Protein backbone atom coordinates (compact mmCIF):
# COMPACT_ATOMS: atom_id res chain seq x y z
CA UNK A 1 0.00 0.00 0.00
CA UNK A 2 1.28 3.45 -0.84
CA UNK A 3 2.28 5.83 1.92
CA UNK A 4 -0.16 8.75 1.98
CA UNK A 5 0.04 12.05 3.82
CA UNK A 6 -2.21 15.07 4.03
CA UNK A 7 -2.26 17.40 1.04
CA UNK A 8 -1.18 20.39 3.12
CA UNK A 9 1.88 18.51 4.39
CA UNK A 10 2.79 17.38 0.86
CA UNK A 11 2.78 20.95 -0.42
CA UNK A 12 4.76 22.18 2.60
CA UNK A 13 7.33 19.45 2.01
CA UNK A 14 7.60 20.51 -1.64
CA UNK A 15 8.18 24.14 -0.59
CA UNK A 16 10.85 23.09 1.91
CA UNK A 17 12.59 21.02 -0.76
CA UNK A 18 12.64 24.10 -3.03
CA UNK A 19 14.57 25.97 -0.33
CA UNK A 20 17.19 23.23 -0.08
CA UNK A 21 17.43 22.86 -3.86
CA UNK A 22 17.97 26.63 -4.07
CA UNK A 23 20.80 26.44 -1.53
CA UNK A 24 22.41 23.54 -3.40
CA UNK A 25 22.20 25.41 -6.71
CA UNK A 26 23.79 28.47 -5.12
CA UNK A 27 26.50 26.31 -3.55
CA UNK A 28 27.27 24.80 -6.97
CA UNK A 29 27.71 28.37 -8.20
CA UNK A 30 30.62 28.76 -5.78
CA UNK A 31 32.58 26.21 -7.80
CA UNK A 32 32.47 28.54 -10.81
CA UNK A 33 34.17 31.56 -9.20
CA UNK A 34 36.48 31.86 -12.20
CA UNK A 35 33.52 32.60 -14.47
CA UNK A 36 31.51 35.50 -13.12
CA UNK A 37 28.75 34.77 -15.61
CA UNK A 38 28.30 31.12 -14.53
CA UNK A 39 28.57 31.95 -10.83
CA UNK A 40 25.97 34.69 -11.21
CA UNK A 41 23.69 32.40 -13.21
CA UNK A 42 23.73 29.72 -10.49
CA UNK A 43 23.20 32.32 -7.75
CA UNK A 44 20.21 33.78 -9.59
CA UNK A 45 18.72 30.32 -10.24
CA UNK A 46 19.12 29.44 -6.56
CA UNK A 47 17.52 32.70 -5.54
CA UNK A 48 14.60 32.03 -7.92
CA UNK A 49 14.11 28.61 -6.34
CA UNK A 50 14.01 30.13 -2.87
CA UNK A 51 11.64 32.85 -4.10
CA UNK A 52 9.35 30.22 -5.61
CA UNK A 53 9.41 28.42 -2.27
CA UNK A 54 8.25 31.61 -0.56
CA UNK A 55 5.37 31.90 -3.03
CA UNK A 56 4.37 28.26 -2.45
CA UNK A 57 4.48 28.75 1.34
CA UNK A 58 2.29 31.86 0.98
CA UNK A 59 -0.15 30.00 -1.29
CA UNK A 60 -0.48 26.98 1.04
CA UNK A 61 -0.92 29.34 3.98
CA UNK A 62 -3.83 31.02 2.26
CA UNK A 63 -5.25 27.64 1.24
CA UNK A 64 -4.82 26.32 4.77
CA UNK A 65 -6.93 29.13 6.23
CA UNK A 66 -9.84 28.04 3.98
CA UNK A 67 -9.53 24.31 4.74
CA UNK A 68 -12.29 22.58 6.68
CA UNK A 69 -11.27 21.75 10.26
CA UNK A 70 -12.48 18.44 11.67
CA UNK A 71 -11.76 16.22 14.65
CA UNK A 72 -10.07 12.98 13.62
CA UNK A 73 -12.07 10.02 14.99
CA UNK A 74 -8.92 7.91 15.45
CA UNK A 75 -6.54 10.27 17.31
CA UNK A 76 -9.14 12.89 18.36
CA UNK A 77 -6.91 15.78 17.26
CA UNK A 78 -8.04 18.67 15.09
CA UNK A 79 -6.92 18.40 11.46
CA UNK A 80 -7.70 20.08 8.15
CA UNK A 81 -9.27 18.54 5.04
CA UNK A 82 -8.66 19.75 1.49
CA UNK A 83 -10.93 18.24 -1.16
CA UNK A 84 -13.33 15.30 -0.81
CA UNK A 85 -10.83 12.96 0.84
CA UNK A 86 -7.67 13.65 2.80
CA UNK A 87 -5.50 12.12 5.51
CA UNK A 88 -5.25 13.16 9.14
CA UNK A 89 -2.08 15.23 9.62
CA UNK A 90 -1.30 13.40 12.86
CA UNK A 91 -2.20 9.72 12.47
CA UNK A 92 -2.78 9.40 8.68
CA UNK A 93 -6.34 8.18 9.11
CA UNK A 94 -8.34 8.56 5.86
CA UNK A 95 -10.99 11.27 6.28
CA UNK A 96 -13.91 12.38 4.14
CA UNK A 97 -16.87 14.73 4.44
CA UNK A 98 -18.70 12.99 1.56
CA UNK A 99 -21.29 10.53 2.92
CA UNK A 100 -21.09 8.55 -0.33
CA UNK A 101 -17.42 7.74 0.27
CA UNK A 102 -17.69 6.62 3.90
CA UNK A 103 -16.43 3.07 4.36
CA UNK A 104 -14.72 2.93 0.96
CA UNK A 105 -10.99 2.33 0.60
CA UNK A 106 -8.95 5.54 0.49
CA UNK A 107 -8.05 6.68 -3.01
CA UNK A 108 -6.70 10.11 -3.93
CA UNK A 109 -8.53 9.93 -7.26
CA UNK A 110 -11.77 10.75 -5.41
CA UNK A 111 -10.60 14.39 -5.42
CA UNK A 112 -10.63 14.56 -9.23
CA UNK A 113 -13.73 16.04 -10.80
CA UNK A 114 -14.05 13.19 -13.33
CA UNK A 115 -13.66 10.41 -10.76
CA UNK A 116 -15.56 7.33 -11.88
CA UNK A 117 -15.13 5.26 -8.72
Curated annotation (Swiss-Prot):
Pfam families: DUF2614 (PF11023). It comes from Bacillus velezensis (strain DSM 23117 / BGSC 10A6 / LMG 26770 / FZB42). The keyword ATP-binding does not apply. InterPro entries: UPF0295. This is UPF0295 protein RBAM_008830. It comes from the Bacteria. It is a multi-pass membrane protein. It is found in: Cell membrane. GO terms for cellular component: plasma membrane.
Amino acid sequence: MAKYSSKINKIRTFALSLVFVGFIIMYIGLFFKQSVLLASLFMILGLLSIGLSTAVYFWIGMLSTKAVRVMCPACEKETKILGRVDMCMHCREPLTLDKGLEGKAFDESYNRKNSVK
